[in-house]
């Protein structure tokens, strides 16, 4: 006998034992052996063991161990649980499996909720979430709210908001109460191309039962971001809609919206700020690539969270680059063109790119997309009507005035009308359905501004900035275009100015605390974040944010890396 061998062992038979135990208990139940409780629903009797039911349900445990009368009874009657649902739950108690379908879930979930069987309740909610579509999401949302299924309620609400344009054409939408409708259209995350969609949805809901519902018009209209509607639309609304024209409160709301367009001093009031919050407003900043030194081209990417004033690193670019364009479309970050550098023996090679990369926040990965028709660095990029526009720039030999747009549906770049002049190192912005090309170099420093009208496929000059600028930041909020920092050909700038399209006028605002060129700028919650750049003596990672209401600057947490001539966007 080998005395070195262990004299004992611990056999782990947990899985086999559990399986055997469940099978044995289930056989006892099926044969009505050792059963000590009968659950009765109508004329149906379900035999079971108290200890098994109590082990999976706090409800049953309280019933069989507490001071309730059922403790001593051998039969309990249920009047508020569906027979098939109770059968399914008892089956689950003995087998660990439960059948969930569209036919059973509406009775099974309330039963699991009443009996406090969390695992079954969780699976029912997961099943309903997988079944969400425009025709049932409102009903599922109500169902979840009734039974306190918080996560399912949030998922259904998110689905409603993301698919609002389809949801507002369904029967469930027209059967909403005015309070439920008001809650939906007040949501900041409503996914609509324009605020007109929200108004038309409300109008359709009211016309579904106009006699009963027209009394809610003013209350509901107050949830529409009316200042985000065009002057033309607001005017036509007043002229063509007698329900609005005949209601004093509605007329007042329309007049206030028109003031926003014609009286710019009203835009900086607190109430106007609330009424002009964009739907699906950006919540985080994304800083991409750039330079951190004379020959240091970055591929790193980082994200800023205003809630806790902090930055984290993300997946790097496929190609290190700087002086590129950046934008967000369908919650994906597009990085377009720019300069790639590579080091060869005794020299640094600069390549002007026509390549495009796209970052998916769901997977934290970068993928390549279709290349532009032309190589472009120091270009302007913006999204207009669901298409990505790439403007001007420099191809390594010439300054460009050409413009092309990327159409996601056909995955192609197509040319559009060129700008009136060549521009590089400039900024592009979209406001009120128009595309602006601002400042830049071509081949002199410029303060000129031109505007593209997509309906005419043509450009026109508008009022110039006060300062000439290259490599500056731009942001749009409260109906204004803000430009900040840059270089005027002589010195680095700390100045900021805003453009009012209705007055066709630029106004100088309070300057930054320090000058910056090659700076990034983006808007979150009506703050203009100004990030990184070069001060004239050093590369920066510092961040300031501008509050247009108080015309003041505040400090925020700095980036992980110093960056200049990089991409910054909000999403």
Swiss-Prot record:
Keywords: Kelch repeat, Repeat
Membrane-spanning intervals of the chain: none
Record keyword Coiled coil present: no
Xref: PROSITE patterns: BTB (PS50097)
Record domain BTB: where: 35-102
InterPro entries found in the cross-reference section: BACK, BTB-kelch_protein, BTB/POZ_dom, Gal_Oxase/kelch_b-propeller, Kelch-typ_b-propeller, Kelch_1, SKP1/BTB/POZ_sf
UniProt keyword Repeat present: yes
Cited CDD domains: BACK_KLHL28_BTBD5, BTB_POZ_KLHL28_BTBD5
Extent of the Kelch repeats: 284-331, 332-386, 387-433, 435-479, 480-526, 528-570
Cysteine-cysteine disulfides: none
Name assigned to this protein: Kelch-like protein 28
Organism, scientific name: Mus musculus
The gene coding this protein: Klhl28
């Amino acid at each position: 006998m080998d005395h070195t061998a262990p004299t004992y062992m611990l056999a782990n038979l947990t899985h086999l034992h559990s399986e055997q135990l469940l099978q044995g208990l289930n056989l006892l139940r099926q044969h009505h052996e050792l059963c000590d409780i009968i659950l009765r629903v109508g004329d149906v009797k379900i035999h079971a063991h108290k200890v098994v039911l109590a082990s999976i349900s706090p409800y049953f445990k309280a019933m069989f161990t507490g001071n309730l009368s059922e403790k001593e009874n051998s039969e309990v009657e249920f009047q508020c649980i569906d027979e098939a649902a109770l059968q399914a739950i008892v089956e689950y108690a003995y087998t660990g499996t439960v059948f969930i379908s569209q036919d059973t879930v509406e009775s099974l979930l309330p039963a699991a909720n009443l009996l406090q069987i969390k695992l079954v309740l969780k699976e029912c909610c997961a099943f309903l979430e997988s079944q969400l579509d425009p025709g049932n999401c409102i009903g599922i949302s109500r169902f979840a709210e009734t039974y306190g299924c918080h996560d399912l309620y949030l998922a259904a609400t998110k689905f409603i908001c993301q698919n609002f344009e389809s949801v507002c054409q369904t029967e469930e939408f027209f059967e909403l109460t005015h309070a439920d409708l008001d809650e939906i259209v007040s949501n900041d995350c409503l996914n609509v191309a324009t605020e007109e969609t929200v108004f038309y949805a409300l109008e359709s809901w009211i016309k579904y039962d106009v006699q009963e519902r027209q009394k809610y018009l003013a209350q509901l209209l107050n949830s529409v971001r009316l200042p985000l509607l065009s002057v033309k639309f607001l005017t036509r609304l007043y002229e063509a809609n007698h329900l609005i024209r005949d209601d004093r409160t509605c007329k007042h709301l329309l007049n206030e919206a028109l003031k926003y367009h014609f009286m710019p001093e009203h835009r900086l009031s607190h109430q106007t700020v609330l009424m002009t919050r964009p739907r699906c407003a950006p919540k985080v900043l994304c800083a991409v690539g750039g330079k951190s030194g004379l020959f240091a081209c970055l591929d790193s990417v980082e994200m800023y969270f205003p809630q806790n004033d902090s930055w984290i690193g993300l997946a790097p670019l496929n190609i290190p680059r700087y002086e590129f364009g950046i934008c967000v479309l369908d919650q994906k970050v597009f990085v377009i063109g720019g300069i790639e550098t590579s080091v060869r023996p005794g020299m640094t090679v600069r390549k002007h790119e026509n390549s495009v990369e796209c970052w998916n926040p769901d997977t934290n990965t970068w993928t390549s997309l279709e290349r532009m028709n032309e190589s472009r660095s120091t270009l302007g990029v913006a999204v207009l009507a669901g298409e990505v526009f790439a403007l001007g720039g420099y191809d390594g030999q010439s300054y460009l005035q050409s413009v092309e747009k990327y159409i996601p549906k056909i995955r192609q770049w197509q040319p559009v009308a060129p700008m009136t002049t060549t521009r590089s190192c400039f900024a592009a912005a979209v406001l009120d359905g128009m595309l602006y090309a601002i400042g830049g170099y071509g081949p002199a420093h410029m303060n000129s501004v031109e505007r593209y009208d997509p309906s005419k496929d043509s450009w026109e000059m508008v009022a110039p900035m006060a300062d000439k600028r290259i490599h500056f930041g731009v942001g749009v909020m409260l109906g204004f275009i803000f430009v900040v920092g840059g270089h005027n050909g002589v010195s680095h700038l700390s100045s900021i100015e805003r453009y009012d399209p209705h007055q066709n006028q630029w106004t100088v605002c309070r300057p930054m605390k320090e000058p910056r060129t090659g700076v990034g700028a983006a808007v979150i919650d009506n703050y203009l974040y100004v990030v990184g750049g070069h001060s004239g003596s050093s590369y920066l990672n510092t961040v300031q944010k501008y509050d247009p209401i108080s015309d003041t600057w505040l400090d925020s947490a700095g980036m992980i890396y110093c960056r200049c001539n990089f991409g910054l966007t909000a999403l």
